[in-house]
């Protein structure tokens, strides 16, 4: 299972980490994922969901 939200598809994003001296280093930011048991197709299943989808009630927890 990838590090991607199973509801909205949110995953890693890349960008630059900028220091005080303005040096740029490539880095990635990961989505804030939680492994939860959710009702999917009428049966409980363990899926990775981002906290934004959890808070907005886009899934029904088991």
From Swiss-Prot:
Keyword Ribosomal protein: yes
Domain of life: Bacteria
Record keyword NAD present: no
Assigned keywords, A-Z: Ribonucleoprotein, Ribosomal protein
Coiled coil: none
GO molecular function: structural constituent of ribosome
Pfam families: Ribosomal_L28
GO cellular component: ribonucleoprotein complex; ribosome
Biological-process GO terms, alphabetical: translation
InterPro entries according to UniProt: Bacterial_rp_bL28, Ribosomal_bL28, Ribosomal_bL28/bL31-like_sf, Ribosomal_bL28_bact-type, Ribosomal_bL28_sf
Family: Belongs to the bacterial ribosomal protein bL28 family.
NCBIfam families (alphabetical): L28 (TIGR00009)
Protein name (Swiss-Prot/TrEMBL): Large ribosomal subunit protein bL28
């Amino acid at each position: 299972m990838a590090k991607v939200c199973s509801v909205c598809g949110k995953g890693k994003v890349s960008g630059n980490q900028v220091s005080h001296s303005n040096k740029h280093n490539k880095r990635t930011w990961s989505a804030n994922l939680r492994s939860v048991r959710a009702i999917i197709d009428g049966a409980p299943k363990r899926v990775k969901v981002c906290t934004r989808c959890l808070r907005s009630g886009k899934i029904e927890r088991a």
